[in-house]
From Swiss-Prot:
Keywords, comma-separated and alphabetical: Autophagy, Cytoplasm, Lipid-binding, Membrane, Repeat, WD repeat
The protein's assembly and partners: Interacts with atg-2; the interaction is direct.
Alphabetized PANTHER family for the sequence: WD-REPEAT PROTEIN INTERACTING WITH PHOSPHOINOSIDES WIPI -RELATED
Organism from which the protein derives: Caenorhabditis elegans
Species classification: Eukaryota, Metazoa, Ecdysozoa, Nematoda, Chromadorea
Description of its domains: The LRRG motif is required for recruitment to phosphatidylinositols including phosphatidylinositol 3-phosphate (PtdIns(3)P), phosphatidylinositol 5-phosphate (PtdIns(5)P), phosphatidylinositol 4-phosphate (PtdIns(4)P) and phosphatidylinositol 3,5-bisphosphate (PtdIns(3,5)P2).
Location within or outside the cell: Cytoplasm; Preautophagosomal structure membrane
Similarity field: Belongs to the WD repeat PROPPIN family.
Gene name for this UniProt entry: epg-6
The WD repeat ranges on this chain: 217-257, 262-301
Tissue: Widely expressed in tissues including pharyngeal, muscle and neuronal tissues.
Principal cellular location given in the protein's record: cytoplasm
Gene3D superfamilies tied to this protein: YVTN repeat-like/Quinoprotein amine dehydrogenase
Protein known as: Ectopic P granules protein 6
GO molecular function annotation: phosphatidylinositol-3,5-bisphosphate binding; phosphatidylinositol-3-phosphate binding; phosphatidylinositol-4-phosphate binding; phosphatidylinositol-5-phosphate binding; protein-macromolecule adaptor activity
Domain of life from the UniProt record: Eukaryota
Length: 388
């Protein structure tokens, strides 16, 4: 059971800080090629944020726009983890170990509209550094290597509960939020090897929590997990990295087995499209696979040989760089069946590929656009979307 004293909260008053010219900031931020520490796409796939040695930056996902409320942004120092609130008013981040302003167990909330840090949460140091963070319109979650913390959000932020979890030093987890029902779920590795747990965060109280759904997905450790926005589908990949499995999160039944490849690979990230029709998976083999969930044949209809093969990807994109986050989008005033898949890469590059399903049922994809995110942010002539 959680205790009120487990996390410490601070509301941060506005600091007196020296004024800095935009010119000086632009010169400092373009000195060398940036390598990202983290990138994340919002739950509704409308925006994304990146973290590096210079702090964080916010962007509209598709079409790409740099999103900052003011030209001058407070110097937050190097950032290791970052998540953007879907309404683009708040950024949640954890400082980097080297040169960071705050401890590794401090969760900072930055108010973009006010252009200042206004809230700080400290998890107990005995649980180690924060390894991942998630935010939805009604819940805030932080994972430590062996502990999970859940708070109310965004108003009157209070800890609801903390739970022990399986050792998870990489913070492997995924959140879902259904805007229709406000249901919020979190998926993360279970205590049994190869299993995944799904917790209904709305059902958590300070006194009790319902037992999470447990799905035995693989024989080896979980490497990646993804939830669709309704929290009804969960996709899992193991350290072997050859097969992705999709389960019904309510019944725990297996739905689809998707074949990424035959050679062992490290899965970098995985994401469902907002419509739940597609699942994208990136690996260290330099490929981004996209599977058609609705086009894949359910497992129960396959014979033994077909099950061993698994369904193949409908689109395969070559990317010779690590992928940190995946998003889906659609550009306004384009054909209804034309959609986009976006990859945010570790070298601070943005890759958009377009795909569509033709009248014969086949999928076609082509390169859409490429951008260097730091250049986009520093280009004074680039259109900047105000954050309201």
């Amino acid at each position: 059971m959680s205790k009120k004293e487990e996390t410490i909260f601070f509301r941060i008053e506005k600091e007196n800080r020296p004024e800095s010219s935009k010119k000086e900031e632009d010169e400092n931020s373009t000195e060398e090629m940036t390598t990202l520490n983290h990138a994340s796409v919002t739950l509704d796939h409308s925006a994304f944020a990146i973290a590096d040695k210079d702090g964080f930056k916010m962007y509209q996902l598709n079409p790409l726009h740099f999103r900052m409320y003011k030209d001058y942004v407070i110097k937050v120092g190097p950032v290791r983890l970052v998540k953007q609130d879907g309404n683009s008013r708040r950024i949640i981040y954890v400082s980097a170990l080297a040169g960071g302003r705050f401890a590794q167990n401090n969760l900072m909330i930055f108010d973009v509209a006010r252009n200042e840090e206004y809230f700080e949460i400290t998890t107990p140091s005995r649980y180690g550094p924060i390894t991942n963070i998630h935010v939805s319109p009604n819940r805030l979650v932080a994972l430590n290597p062996n502990r999970m913390f859940v708070w109310t959000y965004p108003d009157d932020i209070k800890q609801i509960r903390s739970e022990d979890i399986r050792s998870n030093p990489k913070g492997i987890s995924a959140m879902s939020y259904d805007p229709t029902t406000a249901a919020c779920y979190l998926a993360y590795p279970g205590f049994k090897t190869g299993s995944v747990q799904i917790m209904h965060l709305n059902a958590l109280t300070a006194r009790e929590s319902k037992s999470p759904i447990v799905i035995e997905a693989h024989l080896t450790d979980i490497a990646q997990v993804a939830l669709n926005c309704q929290g009804t589908l969960v996709a899992t990949g193991s350290t072997k990295g050859t097969v992705i499995r999709v389960f019904d999160a309510r019944t725990k039944g297996p739905l689809y087995e998707l074949r990424r490849g035959t050679v062992q690979a490290h899965l970098q990230c995985m994401a469902f499209s907002p419509c739940s029709s597609y699942l994208a998976v990136a690996s260290d083999k330099g490929t981004l696979h996209m599977f058609g969930i609705r086009d894949a044949e359910p497992q129960k209809k396959k014979n033994v040989l077909e099950r061993s093969r698994g369904s193949s990807s409908i689109v395969k994109i070559q990317l010779d760089r690590p992928v940190m986050a995946i998003g889906f989008g659609k550009i306004p005033e384009t054909p209804k069946n034309l959609q986009s898949i976006i990859a945010i890469c570790a070298d601070a590059t943005y890759w958009r590929h377009e795909f569509y399903k033709d009248n014969t049922g086949n999928f076609t994809s082509h390169f859409g656009s490429y951008d260097e995110l730091i250049e986009v942010a520093n280009d004074s002539s680039f259109f900047r979307t105000p954050v309201e």
